[in-house]
Amino acid sequence: MSTIGIRRNPTVEAPGIDHMVGFESLDDVLQYADVIAMCVPSTPSTHHLLNAERIAKLKTDAIVINAGRGDAIDTQALADALANGMIRGAGLDVTEPEPLPVASPLWSEPKCLITPHVAGGNHLESTERRIIAIALGNVRCYANGQSLDNRMPLKG
């Protein structure tokens, strides 16, 4: 397994990244990704960075994670891709819009895990341990087709 990083200045190395490329290479590397971990700011150049056209380039077993800003992903394109089996799943800590409307199909999409915008936050050590324990427990439950802890029933 190798890790490909994408950044504005690809000459700057980052720990854990095997191969760094610039944003101009994004379309070329998407087809190789097993996991897309998006941690980008909200700027005009990152708005809907992952859109329907780019989602179509992903492997059908790819997983999309967004822990940056919600508008980096075209929400409707992602919902359509999940519903149509174009990708394996998604983990969203941020959405567009935020909060995600109750009527959004992502809430009932079994291949989508949504967390309440807690990635990257500064917490007490005890709180961080609890967040990690809940998240890991829910990932295990999700992977085994079991009910998730702390799931909120939605009425629309």
Language-model segments: which ranges?
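Rossmann-like dinucleotide-binding domain for NAD(H)/NADP(H)
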Residues: 61, 67-156
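The conserved SAM/SAH-binding core of class I Rossmann-like methyltransferase domains
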Residues: 6
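Rossmann-like adenosine-cofactor binding region
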Residues: 9-105
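Residues at the starts of beta-strands that form the adenosine-phosphate
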Residues: 1-2
